[in-house]
Amino acid sequence: MKRIVAVTICTVFLLSGLIRIGVGGLMMGQAAGLWAIEGEATEALAETKRFVSERDVNIVGFTPITYFGFIAFMGLVISMGAVGQLRRKRWGLVLICLYIVCHAFLFVNFMTVNPKLLFLVLASVMTGVLWWAGRGDGSGAVKRQGAA
């Protein structure tokens, strides 16, 4: 049962990571003027530009391009972490934890709290479940069902 839960969680992390990579790359190109996609992409870019410019605090100094690059980086980290966790490698859980740190960093960087905080809490809980499911073998990764 632990394995089924862990595989489900890793699949969710992998899919969300791939979405972050795709959206981050798409929006970086949109922000850089490499292409112009109408509709939601235009609205999302305008909203991000407004958000970044209106922040009193932006510790790192994100621009829309670097912000979307960071989103894509987070997607790469969580995707690789999910694959590592599925392969029962300790580094998988380490990368998933790095993703959580990156996600939390965005809230600290902009000194803001918004509904996306719930995604951070959910990801943290899911990571805790992965750790729980894999403990006991020393790897931090989920054991195969029936393995000693």
Predicted features, each with a name:
Residues 1-148:
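Topology signature of small-to-medium multi-pass alpha-helical membrane proteins
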